[in-house]
């Protein structure tokens, strides 16, 4: 009890000293202010931390300490929502990955390969979200750690795209395995290429930006190839059902909306400072990414169930 009272008095004394209400030497006052202050404004943070000039306050200044950076998980700042909006879903995907035998509907025809394909998507979603959350948590550490985190954040995006496409294509082209292998190879190749340009410093330089952007655009557009091929091999209604195009397209639209909001810095651009903690574009992007991933999951599970219903009825073998 005495320890608690001593701590309370110490905190109160620090507050008084920081406010200048008690006599103390300048060094003690500066130390008290440093202890009490956690958040800074745009003008007070280092140049390398400045990314969105429409977010004016709520920054965690460079800590150069993993312990201090970790402590930022337990108080509110302008990255808190970005951290938890992906950390919580990441833990959710990790949980269903561990419990996949009880979360995936089992048919008489279900095999270990089905679990592997669906777990592939769970793993990709977990990797993307946990890397994103870690980046937003650790970016206040230092320029070196922030740069590394940003690279891994992009790597997570590549992993999610690859695992999403490969998993849904497996069931979409279940009856044409050779085509699935071809499209999977194209997807993985683009994924590796985009991962390399995301991780290598050489390709992150300004002069490489157009090529890097073009590669990611081609990566995204490569998903159109299986759709048009499907229209050649199947009827529109069949490909709509087998690849679950409604859910796939809905997820894609949500990704695009999120990217547009992020690129336009909306809504903070129209009212700088108002969305510093809650509701700025990067947060909206995060939520839309999670919803899009859930849409894809719904489509994947529907496609899986459709294939096995057909197998049980003897329509496919």
Curated annotation (Swiss-Prot):
GO biological process, one term: intracellular zinc ion homeostasis
Transmembrane segments: 79-99, 111-131, 154-174, 177-197, 213-233, 243-263, 277-297
Keyword annotations: Fatty acid metabolism, Lipid metabolism, Membrane, Receptor, Transmembrane, Transmembrane helix
The keyword Cytoplasm is annotated on this UniProt entry: no
Inducing or repressing factors: Regulated by OAF1 and PIP2. Highly expressed in presence of glucose. Expressed at lower level in presence of glycerol or glycerol and oleate. Highly expressed in the presence of saturated fatty-acids such as myristate.
Residue numbers on the Extracellular membrane side: 100-110, 175-176, 234-242, 298-317
Pfam families named in the record: HlyIII
Record's bilayer topology term: Multi-pass membrane protein
Localization: Membrane
GO molecular function: signaling receptor activity
InterPro entries: AdipoR/HlyIII-related
Gene Ontology cellular-component terms listed: fungal-type vacuole; plasma membrane
Major subcellular location class: membrane
Cytoplasmic-facing ranges: 1-78, 132-153, 198-212, 264-276
Family according to the record: Belongs to the ADIPOR family.
Task of the protein: Probable receptor, which is involved in metabolic pathways that regulate lipid metabolism such as fatty acid oxidation.
Protein name: ADIPOR-like receptor IZH2
